Amino acid sequence: MTQRKDAPLVALIAGEASGDILGAGLMQALENRYPGARFIGVGGEEMAQAGLTSLFPMEKLSVMGITEVLSHLPELLRLRKSLVRFLLEQRPDVVVGIDSPDFTLPIARRLHDRGLKTVHYVSPSVWAWRQGRIKGIKKSIDLMLTLLPFEARFYEEHDVPVAFVGHPLADRIPLETDVAGARKALALDRDARILAVLPGSRGGEVGQLMPAFLDAMVALNHQDPTLQYVIPAANAARREQIQTLLNTQPNLPVSLIDGQSRTVMAAADVVLMASGTATLEGLLLNKPMVVGYRVGAVTYAIVSRLIKSEFFSLPNLLCRQEMVPELLQSQLTTEAIVAAVRRWFDQPEQAQALKIQFQSVHQQLRGGASEKAAAAVARLLEA
């Protein structure tokens, strides 16, 4: 299907909520450049509102961990096959896979082999583990768009076309956090000491982390009954899952809130959270945090042998040093969580030093990420 240069057909594939946000920003920036552009592929509500015609619901791609992926593998393979067939029929001017690399990069390889221009937006953690993937990536895409500067350096070293675009969240989130405004918006006590607890957005993630987080909350409550807890539930299913666990501790002073995770973090003094994109939001909000990561035993046995990076949380990777405690797998004990959380509450001077470092990183990541990504895609379209 041949398109006019000023009205390209752009395919985008997102598999998670964070990718949906990035995709919507890219679509809006591309539409500013090409008012007649059309968008097809797979996305969520944000991308739909930006004008995407989605082949199937993005939620079908949201699975976690190796064993979890295996249980969904037949359906994922079927979806991938139908998506490849659809895109080969449509022949878009460019195909942009957004994150979810185990799903999107094999699609890019097939489409690239058939002459379509392909872009991957959000680098997989190839610099941290399974570095051999770089060879396959190089054969699958015309361009990598990275959110973080150290990722771009890695691709340059391996002769993969790359553009560092920064992170859209760094543009959206102010350098100074309005704690009082966030607390007012959530009807929280202005003077309370608040711990935000973010156990993740996926069922498997919450199932792995929330019991450990809850045990720590109970222990903290015994030590300091004045401490308050706020948990944002990513969706109705996560709310029900979390509420079931909270029902076992009816006397805990906890507020369970629908969504608004960024506002919840902004309102908090300290954040206890799952590893992932939300840790970057925590950094941009200047929040002291404790980061937990736990997956199934089989997944961890495989992953632990392949990890090359010293850190797994984005704040530590971006700062190139251990700024926040990371509790991995068996390290995620009640005692360790309590000690790490208490350290932030008891040592405000360390929290202030953290804020200075985080604001420096925030500045590096600012500067119109969606527009930079659109400019890089436009250069490829017009090449």
Swiss-Prot record:
What does it catalyze?
a lipid X + a UDP-2-N,3-O-bis[(3R)-3-hydroxyacyl]-alpha-D-glucosamine = a lipid A disaccharide + UDP + H(+)
Specify the species.
Alcanivorax borkumensis (strain ATCC 700651 / DSM 11573 / NCIMB 13689 / SK2)
What this chain does, per the record?
Condensation of UDP-2,3-diacylglucosamine and 2,3-diacylglucosamine-1-phosphate to form lipid A disaccharide, a precursor of lipid A, a phosphorylated glycolipid that anchors the lipopolysaccharide to the outer membrane of the cell.
A Pfam family matched in the record:
LpxB
Q: Which GO terms describe its biological process?
A: lipid A biosynthetic process
Give the pathway listed in the UniProt entry for this protein: Bacterial outer membrane biogenesis; LPS lipid A biosynthesis
* Keywords annotated in UniProt: Glycosyltransferase, Lipid A biosynthesis, Lipid biosynthesis, Lipid metabolism, Transferase
> Which InterPro entries does the protein's record reference?
Glyco_trans_19
What's the domain of life for this entry? Bacteria
Q: Which GO terms describe its cellular component?
A: membrane
Q: What is this protein called?
A: Lipid-A-disaccharide synthase
Q: Which HAMAP family match?
A: LpxB
Answer whether the UniProt record assigns the keyword RNA-binding to this protein: no
Q: Which family does it belong to?
A: Belongs to the LpxB family.
Which molecular function GO terms apply here?
lipid-A-disaccharide synthase activity; phospholipid binding
Q: Which residues form a coiled coil?
A: none
